[in-house]
Amino acid sequence: MIDLFINIASFTIYGIPVIPLFIIVFVILSYYLLLLHDESPLWLEKENVYIDVKEGEQHQFPSLVENKNPIDNIYLSVIVPAYNEQIRLPSMLDDAIKFLNEKSKKDLKFSYEIIIIDDGSKDSTAKLVTSYIEKQPSSNIRLLKLKQNRGKGGAVKRGILCSRGKYCLMVDADGATEFKDFNRVEDIMHKIEKNDLGIVCGSRSHLVDSDLVAKRSFLRNILMYGFHIFVQTLCVKGIKDTQCGFKLFTRETARRIFPTLHIERWAFDVEILYLAQKLNIPIAEVAVNWTEIDGSKLDPFSSSIQMAKDIVRIRFRYLLGIWKIKS
């Protein structure tokens, strides 16, 4: 046995001892995945502000954390993260505004705001949003312009922390999910909501055997299934589709989860649902109409690597108490 250990210990690759090399790699990976502090500050200077077009003045966004109850009787806050979305955003906004205005006319108690988070775009996304604001009452649409790119999770977090509504609906800027599905998501929310807590996730799991998925590349489908198994194993149990960008939160749920959210890139949905399950917040999935839209910023291979690293962070940083779950 001792001789075997000596042989293993003396084994080398290109003259480099394997065991010391393994220890060094393990320490570096552990530091990078578990201990490295890699989060950006919540706000940069004069970042959490919007321009009131009617008044021509700059105002600070309200704080979700400091305001337990909805502000200005807003029922729904629609949160739209946008990075270089000047081409795809107009179709989504037109669909959303039409639906929301019609709903407001039918239900006088229904009111809404749309917060579009320009996540450090290099195109004319902010200019486009400003043109929509000028067409709409200034209280309906607000632009949160981040000075640097934070990632989808970082943009959504900051948008929700500025929201006024009783409910917060996260939607993608590409309009992949039909906005009319909000009615279905809202109905389920009213059924599961308990003590002002609840999350309803739009789900594409019913499309797994459809042509939409069949037409994807073999690599992309393999990565999709592998990611699902990885998430189920390490973090979130029982949710078929963690990544759909159509999610509804109660205000109290948002107040409990988003202030301490750490992941700012694509895997932030996993952290949201991981925390929700740990806090016993009711969660439901609802099938939504979904269409793949050209122009995605997601590179399947590199994004999968980033998401895998983030999922490891989520699991072990909370497990080791590096990140705290606040009730």
Swiss-Prot record:
UniProt keyword annotation of NAD present: no
GO molecular function: dolichyl-phosphate beta-glucosyltransferase activity
Record key words, sorted: Endoplasmic reticulum, Glycosyltransferase, Membrane, Signal-anchor, Transferase, Transmembrane, Transmembrane helix
Residues on Lumenal side: 1-15
GO CC field: endoplasmic reticulum membrane
EC main group: transferase
Transmembrane segments: 16-36
SUPFAM superfamilies per record: Nucleotide-diphospho-sugar transferases
Pathway in which this enzyme or protein is active: Protein modification; protein glycosylation
Entry EC number(s): 2.4.1.117
Primary site of residence: endoplasmic reticulum
Top-level lineage group: Eukaryota
Single biological process term from Gene Ontology: protein N-linked glycosylation
Catalytic reaction equation(s): a di-trans,poly-cis-dolichyl phosphate + UDP-alpha-D-glucose = a di-trans,poly-cis-dolichyl beta-D-glucosyl phosphate + UDP
Listed CDD domains: DPG_synthase
Membrane association type: Single-pass membrane protein
Cytoplasmic side: 37-327
Function: Endoplasmic reticulum membrane-bound UDP-glucose:dolichyl-phosphate glucosyltransferase involved in protein N-linked glycosylation.
Protein name: Dolichyl-phosphate beta-glucosyltransferase
